Amino acid sequence: MQSVTYRRRDYLFAVRRKVVDDQLGWTICMRSPRTHEWLPVLGERPFAGHAEAEARLVRLAKDNKWEVAYAYGIDFASPENK
């Protein structure tokens, strides 16, 4: 399984398995810098599959210019020298 955690300032964003509205699913969450608790991002619905949720997180990260904080199970290509 592939998993990426993104960072924006002191906040981390990742896909977590959580119960939201009495439904267990994959949810895009934000880690609170004060409590260190993973909280569901408001307005984002739970996904049935992990790949769906990761794809949505990648789109959000690209649109908001978040940087990669951690990556598991993904090989990133080394930057090319120009």
How would you label these PLM feature ranges?
Residues 18, 48, 53, 63-66, ...:
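N-terminal processing/targeting junctions
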Residues 3, 13, 25, 40-43, ...:
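Compositionally biased amphipathic helical and low-complexity segments enriched in hydrophobic
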Residues 58-71:
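Short arginine-rich
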Residues 53, 68, 72-75:
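Residue-level detector of alpha-helical recognition elements and their boundaries
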Residues 29-54, 60:
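A short, exposed loop/beta-hairpin motif centered on an aromatic-Gly-Thr core
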Residues 1-30, 34, 71, 77-82:
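Short N-terminal "domain-start" leader segments
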